[in-house]
Swiss-Prot record:
This is Large ribosomal subunit protein uL4. The keyword Oxidoreductase does not apply. Keywords: Antibiotic resistance, Ribonucleoprotein, Ribosomal protein. Residues 49-78 are annotated as: Disordered. GO terms for cellular component: ribonucleoprotein complex; ribosome. Part of the 50S ribosomal subunit.
Amino acid sequence: MANVKLFDQTGKEVSSVELNDAIFGIEPNESVVFDVVISQRASLRQGTHAVKNRSAVSGGGRKPWRQKGTGRARQGSIRSPQWRGGGVVFGPTPRSYGYKLPQKVRRLALKSVYSAKVAEDKFVAVEGLSFAAPKTAEFAKVLSALSIDTKVLVLVEEGNEFAALSARNLPNVTVATAATASVLDIVNADKLLVTKEAISTIEEVLA
């Protein structure tokens, strides 16, 4: 099993923590990670685009001129697609771009990105993140003590609201729970800051 250093909130190394190789030590599957990232990015699209077809455009209920005898081309409505101000043919309609991948694929992608962060030495384990009250300055001190000055994803245990509230005003800091962190969140972060309890949760979820 891989060992990573365990720090406290002051940046002092207190011990080490063993990571499950089946989750944090596999060979990253880049193809699977790519598929899951594309899927999750697609799910973020709003899909609210819409245009009016000839039935939705106002007006055009009356035939503009009689069928025969005018010398002009026959027309049934001034809202036909060939008319200025007419309806759009085959335009975009509201839709969901999201699609689901098999659970095994999603789990393999999570294991792959966690393993990649550990292998690249971008996985920082901390004993805990406890705050008496939501204080942005206190959270900034923790990051400074741990020498984290890049885009970071902080993974905490469920119910640690003060950590999330303390970090929400800090640029380049995202807080998520260990059970809900997505592959896209992890890929977008330069470093992971993970509490000891969150590591246990990750191993329970992905075991």
